[in-house]
């Protein structure tokens, strides 16, 4: 497998956004928001699922990831302007949005603030807003923590570990594509990871209660990263939300992605 061609959108302020397109060229348009951290380059089983779908998925790197220009101090709601520009460049007047984990709030921002263009929103293993009483994160301390976690992950890879930590698999170090994905996320993407964490810990810049488009929320029964409390909160505060539960952890198998893609296509 080789990664799809990377495209670059130049913004009027001199910044760029990098993205890849997956799925059939005539498919139903969807803008996909990566988890935190992640990359526009996806692992083979997910690429196969996107290829089977009836969707044309634009997977972009938020500022600070993958060569997309960093934007220090960005908020979750700032993703709306990026998505509007990306959709305009594709000629998409209307489209759906999808977000996994830390990408979930960014997809929900589009559902809330681009309701005239967003048809539906799917969220996988999404997080809820931070507790207002929680102490603010300090960037320097957070950057140190991110660097430590990234070093641990890449150390596991150097020792012959698989790309995904969800189970046994071939050594990622022997797969150039896997190594490219890992380096993009855990070596070159730490600015984006830090900025995501800061944005998620601050007010998001929109009200969940104002969302009017259909929202599907998927969570795993054994998610060790994001507890069921997050999905419960989102279901309570988003008037149009419907919940779906699958057996498994934070990263589901291809069948769940197939289900999500089918849901998006039929809304």
Summary of predicted features, one role per range:
Residues 141-206:
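Alpha/beta-hydrolase
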Residues 15-69:
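Conserved HGGG/HGGXW glycine-rich cap/lid loop of the alpha/beta-hydrolase fold
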Residues 240-267:
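Catalytic active-site module of serine/aspartate enzymes centered on a nucleophile-bearing elbow/loop
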Residues 211, 217-219:
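Short beta-strand/loop motif that positions the catalytic acidic residue
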């Amino acid at each position: 497998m080789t990664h799809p061609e990377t495209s670059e959108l130049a913004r009027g302020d001199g910044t760029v956004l990098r993205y890849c397109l997956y799925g059939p060229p005539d498919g139903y348009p969807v803008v996909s928001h990566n988890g935190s951290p992640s990359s526009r380059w996806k692992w083979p089983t997910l690429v196969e699922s996107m290829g089977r779908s009836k969707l044309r998925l634009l997977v972009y790197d938020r500022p600070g990831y993958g060569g997309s220009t960093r934007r220090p101090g960005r908020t979750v709601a700032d993703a709306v302007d990026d998505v509007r520009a990306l959709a305009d460049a594709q000629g998409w007047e209307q489209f759906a949005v999808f977000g996994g984990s830390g990408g979930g709030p960014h997809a929900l921002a589009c559902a809330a603030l681009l309701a005239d263009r967003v048809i539906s929103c799917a969220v996988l293993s999404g997080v809820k807003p931070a507790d207002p009483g929680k102490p603010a994160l300090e960037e320097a301390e957070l950057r140190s923590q991110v660097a430590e976690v990234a070093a641990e992950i890449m150390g596991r890879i150097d020792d012959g570990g698989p790309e995904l930590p969800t189970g046994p698999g071939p050594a990622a170090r022997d797969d150039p594509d896997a190594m490219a994905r890992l380096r993009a996320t855990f070596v070159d993407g730490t600015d984006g990871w830090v900025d995501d964490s800061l944005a998620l810990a601050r007010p998001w810049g929109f009200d969940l209660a104002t969302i009017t488009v259909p929202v599907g929320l998927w969570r795993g029964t054994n998610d060790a990263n994001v507890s069921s409390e997050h999905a419960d909160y989102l279901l309570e505060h988003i008037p149009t939300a419907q919940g779906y539960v699958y057996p498994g952890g934070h990263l589901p198998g291809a069948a769940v992605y197939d289900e999500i893609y089918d849901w998006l296509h039929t809304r």
